[in-house]
């Protein structure tokens, strides 16, 4: 009986485990990011926080929170992820700046722990852009 148990133990110890997935570009965007969005050069900006993680399937999963408003987390869908560029679709959500239900597309360029870029906001029901601007973020935790 001991021999069978020891053989089973050795076989289990030598069996290949789950292979770690190679880190893809999504891993570069994981973490907590804080930033501001700006509608114009004179705008002081709307503060926000993004919390992002890489799911088991390797995709980037994120939510956005406006840090000065009592609102639920807003879902973010990564549409394009590369080593240096991230394109996200945010929402739908109610924009306090536009006072409308909207979907926002962002295009950001990664440099170290900074992700900066542009955004375009459209009505959630479709149609032309109702707001454009820029954003700046910095990763505060990996």
Cite the ranges covered by each PLM segment.
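Sec-dependent signal peptide recognition
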Residues: 1-7
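N-terminal regions of proteins, emphasizing targeting and processing segments when present
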Residues: 7-8, 85
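C-terminal motif of bacterial Sec signal peptides marking the signal peptidase cleavage site
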Residues: 11-13
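Bacterial signal peptide processing site
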Residues: 15-18
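Outer-membrane beta-barrel biogenesis signature
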Residues: 20-22
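Central antiparallel beta-sheet cores of small beta-barrel/beta-sandwich binding domains
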Residues: 25-110, 118-119, 124-142
